[in-house]
Amino acid sequence: MSSSVYITVELVIAVLAILGNVLVCWAVWINSNLQNVTNYFVVSLAAADIAVGVLAIPFAITISTGFCAACHGCLFFACFVLVLTQSSIFSLLTITIDRYIAIRIPLRYNGLVTCTRAKGIIAICWVLSFAIGLTPMLGWNNCSQPKGDKNHSESCDEGQVTCLFEDVVPMNYMVYYNFFAFVLVPLLLMLGIYLRIFLAARRQLKQMESQPLPGERTRSTLQKEVHPAKSLAIIVGLFALCCLPLNIINCFTFFCPECDHAPPWLMYLTIILSHGNSVVNPLIYAYRIREFRQTFRKIIRSHILRRRELFKAGGTSARASAAHSPEGEQVSLRLNGHPPGVWANGSALRPEQRPNGYVLGLVSGRSAQRSHGDASLSDVELLSHEHKGTCPESPSLEDPPAHGGAGVS
């Protein structure tokens, strides 16, 4: 694999990672049914994947060129992707523990898992991720080694090094500290927790079949709780498959220095695989989780496809501005310089207000009637929701909301 092919694939992954994970965050923002503690951790994971596309992949491409830089500047580029990897691992671990509590001790879930605690845990995870990933910046690096053929090029000025990952980040840090302590151990812990989740669920289902007890959870309720655990277990498994190959190569490089170094094409492939994991999660949400899938469709139809059609139709430009009032939201449109509230033909625009916060524009005196659950638009329609929802203390996985959503299900 040539460097040009590697760079092209990395750029495609970056774009897909940004778009897909922005869609995840957007879905949680606009759909109150998705605003629960579990999905707060999902948003944290999506934020790390967005940062991979925005920062980590450009940094990796830059390092692959072997440019000349100050050692600590190169070190920051090399270590930042480790910060995001660590944040992803911590997010997956918190999601796993959240699901374990919901299934094993559901009656105590509301008291143990609250929004305030979830936000605090997310903040702690990000602080720890930066501390672990940027540890080489504090001295555990190769910058203090004498400059030789390994980490210095004659083409670089004095005080600069050829910026390559293995030349500035020591392999003992990558293997013992980063991989063994903070990648492998959390992955094994998640594996053990998911095994306990599925074994406990299987045992409870067998008890329900043999001797149903009054007051126990129904079979359908338990299955609704196990289904998201399966989806999240798939995400953890794919994360392990994507990140382990590169770490295994690092182990071979460290424990067998006399062995031949991995060929460039294999290094490129494992790096692409580790970054490609950032694209996978939104696809799993869309395929496995109904509420996410429906919200994705509404976003794409309402904010992408219909807007494109409006801009193409007749060359008429429309600018929409929303003014908030205590009773709800109002919409005023200006078409081709005409004042707000008046169409080009002189007829008045009469926006229909609804108590639930949704606003429906009237086009040419004709009402664009829609049901509450339909997010498709008529000729001109602005769909807005005043109330973004609050984080429910009880997970929607156990008690589905009245609107029929189910968080991560």
From Swiss-Prot:
It is a multi-pass membrane protein. GO terms for cellular component: plasma membrane. Residues 30-39, 98-117, 196-231, 288-409 are cytoplasmic. The keyword Membrane applies. Adenosine binds at E166, N250, S274, H275. GO terms for molecular function: G protein-coupled adenosine receptor activity. CDD domains: 7tmA_Adenosine_R_A2A. Disulfide bonds join C68-C156, C71-C143, C74-C163, C256-C259. Glycans are attached at N142, N151. GO terms for biological process: adenylate cyclase-activating G protein-coupled receptor signaling pathway; regulation of cell communication; regulation of signaling. Its main location: membrane. Keywords: Cell membrane, Disulfide bond, G-protein coupled receptor, Glycoprotein, Membrane, Receptor, Transducer, Transmembrane, Transmembrane helix, Ubl conjugation. The keyword Nucleus does not apply. Ubiquitinated. Deubiquitinated by USP4; leading to stabilization and expression at the cell surface. Residues 1-4, 64-74, 141-170, 256-263 are extracellular. Receptor for adenosine. The activity of this receptor is mediated by G proteins which activate adenylyl cyclase. The cytoplasmic C-terminal domain is necessary for targeting the non-ubiquitinated form of this protein to the cell surface. Belongs to the G-protein coupled receptor 1 family. This is Adenosine receptor A2a. It comes from Cavia porcellus (Guinea pig). The lineage of its organism: Eukaryota, Metazoa, Chordata, Craniata, Vertebrata.
